[in-house]
Each structure stands twice: as structure tokens, then as C-alpha cells.
Amino acid sequence: MPIPPELALTSEQLDELMLTSWNMRIASMGPGTRINLTPLWFGWAGGNIYTYCRGQKIANLRRNPVATVLVDRNERFPELQGAMFQGRAVVLEDSDAEAADPNMEAVRTQMGSKYAGGHGESAEPRRNESTARGRHWRWVRFEPSRVVTWDNKKIKPRG
């Protein structure tokens, strides 16, 4: 059953969710038929989701770029807000691919500010300088083709 449009996040609410939430979860297809679900730090720019990761996630996305990303917040049902993105992941294989991405500089600055201080405020936000290295450390740009959002705070009480 689809989520009624009146319960969806506005574009401003979606941006706020994506810019302030700490983790996303990405589901990719592992070897065979197993789904690999992993929490990761992320950036949001140009309607795309960016993350820097390694290992099985990169191997999975190279093999099959179809993935789903979930970003949500709050624990109690009446307060749940979130967004599910279905789409395709693009592994940025080298520094040239990173430099060619029009959002990469904004994402590096955003993620540096967001995560530089761990779970507290960073004394001095710094840019995320991570780049492709070795066989599996890569930036990934997730390009959504379908977005579903919800804001349970908008559900009217029965009665």
C-alpha cells in the first residue's frame, strides 16, 4: 500500500533529514542471493547520496549496482520520519572520476564538517580528503530513481 502524499516529507524536510542524519543503511546484493545491509556515513548533494567505503560493499556494487538506501530517525512509531531511495550506485574508481563529479567538493566539505568531531562538535571542521586507494576503498555515488518518504508526525489521531 503506497504512503499517502499528505504523509510525505516536503523537499525542505527531506534535505534537513539528509543533512542532519548521521547514518544511512545501504542494501546491496551480496554473492549469490544474500542481501548485504550496512550502516554507513554519508553525504547528500545534487539529489544523490555519497559515501566512502570499502570491501564487500564495493565488490557487491561493482557486480550489481542496484541498491536501496534508507535514512530514518526517531524510534517511536508516531515520531518516525524517513526516506527510502531505490536506484543505482556508481563506484568512482579513481581520482579522475572523483574530480569529474560536480558534487564531490561540496560532499567532501559537508562530510568533513559533519563527521570530523566524532559524535560531538568538531573544534575545527575539516574537509574529507578521502580518495580511491587500493583495490576496494572508493567513493560511491548513489543515484536514486525512486524516492519514498514518510513523516508519521503528520498522521492524524483517530477519534
Regions found by a protein language model. Name each.
Residues 1-9, 78-159:
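Charged, gly/pro-rich active-site loop segments
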Residues 2-25:
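Short, basic/aromatic recognition patches
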Residues 41-43, 62, 141:
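Well-ordered beta-strand positions
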Residues 54-57, 111-112:
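Short, solvent-exposed aromatic-acidic interface loops
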Residues 57-90:
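Helix-adjacent hinge/juxtasegments
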